Amino acid sequence: METLKSDNKKRVLPSWMTAPGNERKVVSVKTAKRKQTAAIRVGAATRAPAKETVYCMNEAEMVDVALGILIEGRKQEKPWEQPSLVAPDKLQLSPPCSESPHTSSPGSSSEEEDSRTDSPALGLSPARGPEASNSPCSRSPEEGKEEEDELKYVREIFFS
């Protein structure tokens, strides 16, 4: 291919590009409708531009804001139920979901440990006793489905 040299080639620019910017264009308007639209355009050009606020966020900030909006919407849909009249000193903290339902004693045998590894996953095992039904780990299918739908939209927006 040929190498292009700027001094060999001269570009011819159209007249509107070479004309100074201070000149006003004369618009020939044939109909009244065109006159009105031309007047609107001139009026819009002479007005001061509207102020706009532009927010720039990084990805982490956008995810935080999106999750905050989803959580806020959920709170408005289902307001928190008031706890029953129980003394604050008698409230028990529920164990975290990642904690195993089986507790091992210091003298447990290896057979017990093997049987624990063969048991189904925490979320798939049926709830045991009245305490398990109030546990945050055991959720109704509707709650899980709603949360999954909300997170689906977040994933779709940010990771596609």
Swiss-Prot record:
The keyword Transmembrane does not apply. GO terms for molecular function: damaged DNA binding; molecular adaptor activity. Keywords: Acetylation, Chromosome, Cytoplasm, DNA damage, DNA repair, Nucleus. It comes from the Eukaryota. The modification N-acetylmethionine is found at residue 1. It is found in: Cytoplasm; Nucleus; Chromosome. Residues 78-152 are annotated as: Disordered. Pfam families: MRI. InterPro entries: MRI. Cell-cycle-specific regulator of classical non-homologous end joining (NHEJ) of DNA double-strand break (DSB) repair, which can act both as an activator or inhibitor of NHEJ, depending on the cell cycle phase. Acts as a regulator of DNA repair pathway choice by specifically inhibiting classical NHEJ during the S and G2 phases, thereby promoting error-free repair by homologous recombination during cell cycle phases when sister chromatids are present. Interacts (via KBM motif) with XRCC5/Ku80 and XRCC6/Ku70 heterodimer. Interacts (via XLF motif) with TRIM28/KAP1, ATM, MRE11, NBN and RAD50. Interacts with splicing factor SF3B1. Interacts with ERCC6L2; this interaction is DNA independent. The KBM (Ku-binding motif) mediates interaction with XRCC5/Ku80 and XRCC6/Ku70 and recruitment to DNA damage sites. The XLM (XLF-like motif) mediates interaction with DNA damage response proteins TRIM28/KAP1, ATM and members of the MRN complex (MRE11, NBN and RAD50). This is Cell cycle regulator of non-homologous end joining. It comes from Rattus norvegicus (Rat). The lineage of its organism: Eukaryota, Metazoa, Chordata, Craniata, Vertebrata.
